[in-house]
Amino acid sequence: MSTLKPKIVLSRLDGTDWTRKGLRPFLEYRDLGLAEATEGRVGGTIGRAIKKFEPGGGAPRHTHNTSFHLIFVMRGWFRTEFEGLGEVTVRQGDCIAYQGQIPQEHIEYSDDFEVM
């Protein structure tokens, strides 16, 4: 039985702060309020490209310290490689979902790339 108190968070695009952080200097991020709504159990951001791709400018091999991860391409595309999946190009409307810490590398992206 859950001990969480009911909470609702509305994240509007207008007035949202976009921040630059983390492993990907080519993206800026918008926090969707999921961590606030779930007392830190779930997180979620939107990332969008802020500069043109340059060779070698993707995200090097890494893992995410999480039990579940979802990548949904909202706009554009990116070329990526996941252990167990291989190298793929993921396009607008495509989704990758996985559990655990799967090694991955993000190789290339479009100028209009936007991802949740």
Identify the role of each PLM range.
Residues 1-14, 107-116:
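Double-stranded beta-helix
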Residues 17-61, 67:
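A short glycine-rich, His/Asp/Glu-containing loop-to-beta-strand
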Residues 44-45, 95-97, 110-116:
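A short hydrophobic beta-strand segment most commonly corresponding to one strand
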Residues 46, 82-84, 108:
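Residue-level recognition of conserved beta-strand positions in structured domain cores
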Residues 58-59, 64-84:
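Glycine- and acidic-residue-biased ligand/ion/polar-headgroup-sensing regions
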Residues 84-101:
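Short acidic-glycine-tyrosine-enriched beta hairpin
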Residues 101-102, 107:
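Short, surface-exposed secondary-structure boundary micro-motifs
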